[in-house]
Amino acid sequence: MNARETRKKETIRRILDAAAQAFAAAGFEGARMDDIANRAGVNKAMIYYHIGDKRALYTEVLHNIFGDAAARLTANLEHAASPNDKIKAYLRSIFETIERHPHLPPVMMREMAAGGVNLPEIVAGDLASIIGTIA
């Protein structure tokens, strides 16, 4: 990976981290792109260039988190033989995901309070995949 690609990945990571913080604090409707840009240390145009509009940003934040959660669950379930081991692996995955993504619980609580109206379809698919893994 060259220096330009490294800077691009770092910029996107900062944008996604800042967006997760903003969505946790204010919800989808209350989060402002200007605030996210300030938190990330970029101008607003960089967000639109790298990610897109606020809906695309929200989708990307949640899709990344739930993709990570699914990968953790799959890895933790790999060696779980008994139902008891599977429950432990599932709980471990939840705790690991929350530890890595501390903004997830407030974002999801706000989403549930809003009736899921802002939950992107791709994220609903991610959740279904996670549920399918444990079923």
Predicted regions and their residues:
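Amphipathic alpha-helical segments used for helix-helix packing
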Residues: 86, 99-124
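Alpha-helical transmembrane segments of multi-pass integral membrane proteins
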Residues: 59, 63, 92, 124-125
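N-terminal intrinsically disordered/low-complexity leader segments
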Residues: 1-10, 17
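Amphipathic alpha-helical packing segments from all-alpha helical-bundle domains
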Residues: 67-74, 100, 117-135
